Amino acid sequence: AFEAAVAGGIPIIKALREGLTANRIQYIAGIINGTTNYILSEMRERGLDFATALAGAQALGYAEADPTFDIEGVDAAHKLTIMCAIAFGVPMQFDRAYVEGISKLDATDIKYAEDLGYRIKLLGIARRTARGIELRVHPTLIPAKRLIASVEGAMNAVEVHGDAVGATLYYGKGAGAEPTASAVVADLVDVTRLHTADPEHRVPHLAFQPQSLSDTPVLPIEEVTSGYYLRLRVADVTGVLADVTRLLADAGISIDAMLQREAEQIAGDGQTDVVIITHET
């Protein structure tokens, strides 16, 4: 009975709780906040800075007068916590989630990411690993060829991987009167149906009976392995690039891709940007 709380009109809760019941869910990755996705789309497509894109979202009613919960990733983390509980059979642990929003993103980073073949989206990611569960919301570079990277505007999408079905993608409106009403009616029907069954044979709201919940730990972000995006503003002098790569190598960090801009394209003050994407570390 949480359909209206997550991803608007997308029936992702029923998919996780019932449609994919034969699967051991491996991970979930979702664009689950329409406000931030709209802002990022405007920054990429029109080259707007964050403040201008946010003002546009507020003018259209996509963002609240106080947009903190949206732009700082809190709303997405709430939704991700519900999906994680249903997918992995763990208690809701919002306080253990790593949450980072988009307010510090620069249009320059969005352009560099695109030059390297990526798009930046605010993703909610829940992943089952041998050591525990990853539960995190943050800006993420997604290869542009992936379907979820093409989700623009205020739309939502959730990618779910199961061991039997493989990759599945759920796409639709994440907010609005009619999509939300559709989800609310689904919740009401679900609750009514549950009350016609005896407690022992009901499908629990969170898919698992309380006594069956796992105590699998949520991993702190320091224990999560991932590739990273780095943008370094450096002096445009001979040997700087070699110094940067040597420092990364000394730290055991491997470079996957690198991009360097001419100094005159940056500030004309003898500085340049070096953009690096690392391998998982």
Residue ranges of each PLM-predicted region?
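Predominant activation on well-ordered alpha-helical scaffold segments within soluble catalytic domains
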Residues: 13-17, 37-41, 51-58, 77-85, ...
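Low-complexity, glycine/alanine/valine/leucine- and proline-rich hydrophobic stretches
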Residues: 138-163, 177-178, 245, 249-269
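Substrate-binding/catalytic subdomain of NAD(P)-dependent oxidoreductase enzymes
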Residues: 52-150, 155-157, 176
